[in-house]
């Protein structure tokens, strides 16, 4: 058999059919085959390979395996993956979404009998799963160059009209759209053109925010760039901030912006690029659109967030509410998609009035494209929960990795619930579930369908240190070597969206605790950055022991870790760690925890053990404090004394109510040092004076009630 003839025939057939296909070449000479495939694509390709094995000049773009985002947003005749060893699902999913109609996604690897795409010391189930998935691909060719045989092949007959059928000349604009036809001609689908019209109305109207959503490959970012060009042309914007995870991630927006400015004939603008060539600022005589990193971005007359799930819901909320207008894009399904749960959350946090639009047609390939469907199915990029069974009959079960690897329906039903636990999911989550020997999946099953799922990770001395995410932080906070301590970390737990607030999550958690206790674990831990779920863990008897000093780069919130002891050793460690956190929250509240929501700081502090405060008043400070308590001076005039006395009271007692507005205001003002203008907003006071009055009244009351505590802590 002529291997090269088979490969070239497959590629030619793809071009004629306008389908996209998967090509897998098993070979002992990866470099030679990568060069051949790049030649078939005429160099119009993206190559994913290690820097050490980079093949200069064979493809238009290159990305190392750890930076697949370098090629995302690009469009190529082929994407070629030549990665030895571990082949992460995110590499396949990300590269596959860059291939245009009639092109191919190629994986160049070892021959099938020697190819192991999984990690070292894994279970081997990812290899089994991926091999089965390749054979199931409806348009693929898997060939073994060494033996000269076809491992498997398939070519689905498919007819359809895709985005290539889009004709700007036949497009009928909406009445009063105001968008020049020459700008519409820059669109690549009708849904892009409709979205452009809607965004033009958004810029002209009184809307505060707009949400553009859709699966990956629908042209969301590009049409936002066209809309920005329209707004600049109409002089509807001046200064705008463009926020995304990296400069690379916003290049589709910048490409649409520059294309739109060119089409509209807007000259005289200046383009600033990074040393790597990425556009980070476009400015003209009356407008300036500049990229800012999520953690440094400031409010602006217009803020544009490209990929909200990657920026983080907390940052999106902060930026949008403090800016004039907000334009936000989020990916529902696809590589780094957030799922519909997050897409449904965004309208609740964006300022009103608000418009929402969704792009449905792919711009690079046919709708219903078999490669897209394969990627979405195999790597759970469109996983949504199934219809739930009767929850009253639910029973706890452990779902084995073997079942997950071999029964795709079970995997989809489990994964469809788990994706609700995170704002942003990646295909690599699947790799961990199948390959890590320390992962466990537990579920509440009703009528054969999961209604609640927990993803659990075992952490102990036999696990690599970098994988002991919560345990290492717990031992650090406790100041304990913790040799031999084993904990179970609940990485994710979620309940079917139609069955929440019925106690199913707590019931499943109790089952996990029982299994952990039976195995000899000392604690169950968890760590997350979705602060809205803190009450769930506190309700179930967990104590906080760690809050990260920095934001989680995904959610824009700080990571919070909690634990529940299962034996005396675990209880002793957690007690020490939680007391350490109490001191950190109180004493570092005005620095590293100043940006933590005051109500969350109060709630977490209240659920730590009472501890003796290492704080004392001088005689002069005690005198100043008495003056404040008698109403002779305001709190700010005796702030140092109020600070010491209030922190001592909050640390040593737990009789205070963490949700009382006065307490929350006192925490915001005294512990965190926030201005009264912000305190007023936090506690719902209509004026600054009202906020001052409420906070000072509360402080006087709590300090009078704890007089015996702080009055005995005066330095002679």
From Swiss-Prot:
What are the recorded GO MF terms, alphabetically? 18S rRNA cytidine N-acetyltransferase activity; ATP binding; tRNA binding; tRNA N4-acetyltransferase activity
Q: What class of enzyme is it?
A: transferase
InterPro entries, sorted? Acyl_CoA_acyltransferase, GNAT_dom, NAT10/TcmA_helicase, P-loop_NTPase, TmcA/NAT10/Kre33, tRNA_acetyltr_TmcA
| Subcellular locations according to the entry | Cytoplasm
Q: Where is the N-acetyltransferase domain?
A: 401-567
Which sites bind acetyl-CoA? Answer: 493-495, 500-506
User: Which cellular component appears as one GO term in the record?
Assistant: cytoplasm
- Provide this UniProt record's keywords sorted from A to Z: Acyltransferase, ATP-binding, Cytoplasm, Nucleotide-binding, RNA-binding, Transferase, tRNA processing, tRNA-binding
The UniProt entry, under PROSITE patterns, shows: GNAT
Q: What is its main location?
A: cytoplasm
Q: Which reaction does it catalyse?
A: cytidine(34) in elongator tRNA(Met) + acetyl-CoA + ATP + H2O = N(4)-acetylcytidine(34) in elongator tRNA(Met) + ADP + phosphate + CoA + H(+)
Instruction: Report what the protein is called.
Output: tRNA(Met) cytidine acetyltransferase TmcA
Q: What is the lineage of its organism?
A: Archaea, Thermoproteota, Thermoprotei, Desulfurococcales, Desulfurococcaceae
